[in-house]
Amino acid sequence: MLKKTTWIKLPRNVLVGHDVIGDLAAAIEELYLDGRPLIVTSPTPDQLIGNRVRSQFADPQTVSVDHASFDAVEAVIDTAKATDAGYLIGLGGGKPIDTAKMASDRLGCGFVSVPTAASHDGIVSGRSSIPEGDTRHSVAADPPLAVVADTAVLAEAPWELTTAGCADIISNYTAVKDWQLAHRLQDVEYSEYAGALSQMTAEMLVDNSDAIKQGFEESAWLVAKALVSSGVAMSIAGSSRPASGAEHLISHQLDRLVPDAALHGHQVGVASIVTAYLHTGENGEWEDIRAALADVGAPTTATELGIDEEIFIQAITSAHAIRDRHTILGNGVSEAAAREAAVFTDVC
């Protein structure tokens, strides 16, 4: 007798395109959210389009966060209660969006994502990444009820943020392989639909990497659509598995060893070159991944990340201990094997 159940939580409204920031209020109106919004942002995005957002609502409140942290989450919760906010709008990059997402989950209220940079798939997913000391916590939360991604705004963001978003998506290649490996070896539940969607999203960026250029709004359109698809894949799976495997473990270990050395997306992109080699060997997909990263202008080596090569190799050998998630790293990669993979792929 079948006893399986699944509960998939997805955004109800997703707007991506030119000047859609002006449709934010209309997108929220369809959600029938009560009360006034609390806009969670940071100084730069607030200066950029904060007034365009506030002008669409009656008596909106704003709170600015400088860093994503558990203290920032508590501050947003306190402000939301003090201002009697009915729902939260995360306006900006990863810091305000992750903070608002986690705060809304704690408050039990609605959350709307308004990214100003296409830097990572957290703009759509049901995961918040919150640092604490030398550790970065991936915290489960509900995905946003709506996502409004204005490609004109995204195209004006620093290009390195867009290339980080590209690299984050391209790394889905190896995340899906790790998920499939865990399914075969440890009977981890695998969703064919979520896996296929994540894989297709990575392939879309790899196949179009030479068309993603700085200063073109069409590039922001391609990356934003890919980030939405990746976030939806995670919502379907009910976990971060479609977009997070060994490459993310290596990135998290780098965060511990050399905090704030490079952008998250860039770190997982470079790490995925190595993990693809570990999966498929000398003539595998690592070359396609490396070429696509180079096409968009993302780093492809430890040196380009600003990270010492020996530290990068150390991260490969110790990343398996970050969390209990089976990947190609298994119970640990030897230093010799890590060095061979990193040197053969020109990462080190």
From Swiss-Prot:
Bound cofactor: record note: Binds 1 zinc ion per subunit.
CDD domains: Gro1PDH
Positions of substrate binding: 121, 168, 252
Residues that hold Zn(2+) according to the record: 168, 248, 264
Gene Ontology MF: a single term: glycerol-1-phosphate dehydrogenase (NAD+) activity
A Gene Ontology term for the protein's cellular component: cytoplasm
Required cofactor(s): Zn(2+)
Protein's cellular compartments: Cytoplasm
PANTHER family: GLYCEROL DEHYDROGENASE, GLYCEROL DEHYDROGENASE 1
Family to which this protein belongs: Belongs to the glycerol-1-phosphate dehydrogenase family.
Classification via HAMAP family: G1P_dehydrogenase_A (MF_00497_A)
Functional note: Catalyzes the NAD(P)H-dependent reduction of dihydroxyacetonephosphate (DHAP or glycerone phosphate) to glycerol 1-phosphate (G1P). The G1P thus generated is used as the glycerophosphate backbone of phospholipids in the cellular membranes of Archaea.
Name of this chain's protein: Glycerol-1-phosphate dehydrogenase [NAD(P)+]
Native source organism of the sequence: Haloquadratum walsbyi (strain DSM 16790 / HBSQ001)
Record gene name: egsA
